[in-house]
């Protein structure tokens, strides 16, 4: 399945900051250390030189990825018409059949974070939630079988969007 190109404004800004940091701070530091290591002589057994070149390739790879990805991403901002329904950027409180309650936020695939309960728009749960309202029921196929969830609450964190 192809990754979606949606991202929150805060997520786009975080990726942009990472790109700027890598380009303006990290890469120059590593380039300087590689130059210093190269000046020491034999490069074939120079661990600092070899490690520095490897790190420089990793940084360049990440810079290329971020540059292309940021161009392709589409920032999705909250719109008042979304109130009451689940759309991109929504926080949702779900309850399962056992009465367990969890809260999730639907974000882009570049910013999903299980430790924050941020789920990707491309995930089966998020796809089932899109367009639903409070008190709706969704059914999702999980590795252990079908799971049913009830939507208790929907809200948008409009303060962190800008």
From Swiss-Prot:
Pfam families: GreA_GreB, GreA_GreB_N. The keyword Electron transport does not apply. Keywords: Coiled coil, DNA-binding, Transcription, Transcription regulation. GO terms for molecular function: DNA binding; RNA polymerase binding. PROSITE patterns: GREAB_1, GREAB_2. The keyword Phosphoprotein does not apply. GO terms for biological process: DNA-templated transcription elongation; regulation of DNA-templated transcription elongation. Residues 52-76 form a coiled coil. Necessary for efficient RNA polymerase transcription elongation past template-encoded arresting sites. The arresting sites in DNA have the property of trapping a certain fraction of elongating RNA polymerases that pass through, resulting in locked ternary complexes. Cleavage of the nascent transcript by cleavage factors such as GreA or GreB allows the resumption of elongation from the new 3'terminus. GreB releases sequences of up to 9 nucleotides in length. PANTHER family: TRANSCRIPTION ELONGATION FACTOR GREA, TRANSCRIPTION ELONGATION FACTOR GREB. Belongs to the GreA/GreB family. GreB subfamily. This is Transcription elongation factor GreB. It comes from Haemophilus ducreyi (strain 35000HP / ATCC 700724). The gene is greB.
């Amino acid at each position: 399945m192809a990754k979606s190109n949606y991202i929150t404004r805060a997520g786009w800004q975080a990726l942009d900051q990472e790109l700027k940091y890598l380009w303006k701070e990290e890469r120059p530091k590593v380039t300087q250390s590689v130059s210093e290591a190269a000046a020491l002589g034999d490069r074939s057994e120079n661990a600092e030189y070899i490690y520095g070149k490897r790190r420089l390739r990793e940084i360049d790879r990440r810079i290329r990825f971020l540059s292309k990805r940021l161009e392709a991403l589409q920032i999705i901002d909250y719109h008042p018409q979304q109130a009451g329904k689940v759309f991109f950027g929504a926080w949702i409180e779900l309850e399962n059949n056992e009465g367990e309650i969890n809260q999730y936020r639907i974000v882009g695939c570049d910013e999903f974070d299980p430790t924050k309960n941020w789920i990707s728009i491309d995930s089966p749960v998020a796809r089932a939630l899109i367009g639903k309202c409070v008190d709706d029921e969704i059914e999702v196929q999980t590795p252990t079988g079908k799971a049913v969830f009830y939507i208790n609450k929907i809200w948008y964190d409009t303060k962190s969007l800008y």
